[in-house]
Amino acid sequence: MDNKRKLLKELYMGRPIFQWGYSIALDFHYKEIIIDNETVSFQVSTNLLWNTHGSAFGDSKIYYRDVDCCVLCFGIHNEQSFNNLIYWIKELEANTLVDEKVPFVLIGTKSDIERTEKSISKERIEQWCKNKQKNSINISTLHHRMGY
């Protein structure tokens, strides 16, 4: 099971899950949590968690047209995965029906694998986020080691 699926399962089940079957074409999850005394609703399509590696994803536009937030995951050892982030930001912004800018949360996966000289540095990731924020892209980073 990849880290994106582990993250989603932990959100919905409240604890790490070690096995999860494959998602189907319209596999949606819904959860409400309380943040700062306010109820926040999550509706997540597991379709957006498939490993697309930056390739076109058919008619995925129908899945994110009404989004309020986007979680972008990339492998910290995969340059192409990191470079594809801007593609997905532009894709989402071009195809949402919401009037406001969509906030993004950036998650680097595969932190359980030892870093090499080809790994993307934390400093580079943070600089990338700062540059995007200057361009009015609302990006937050999540520094969390998936310790399963």
Curated annotation (Swiss-Prot):
What is the name of the protein in this document?
A: Ras-related protein RabK3
Q: Name one GO molecular function term.
A: GTPase activity
Record's GO cellular component terms: late endosome; lysosome; phagocytic vesicle
One example of a Gene Ontology biological process annotation:
phagosome-lysosome fusion
Keyword terms? GTP-binding, Nucleotide-binding
Q: Which InterPro entries match?
A: P-loop_NTPase, Small_GTPase
Is GTP-binding a UniProt keyword of this protein? yes
Motif position, Effector region: 21-28
| Top-level taxonomic group | Eukaryota
Residues binding GTP: N51, T52, H53, G54, S55, T109, K110, S111, D112
| Keyword Nucleotide-binding applies | yes
Concerning SMART domains, the annotation shows:
RAB
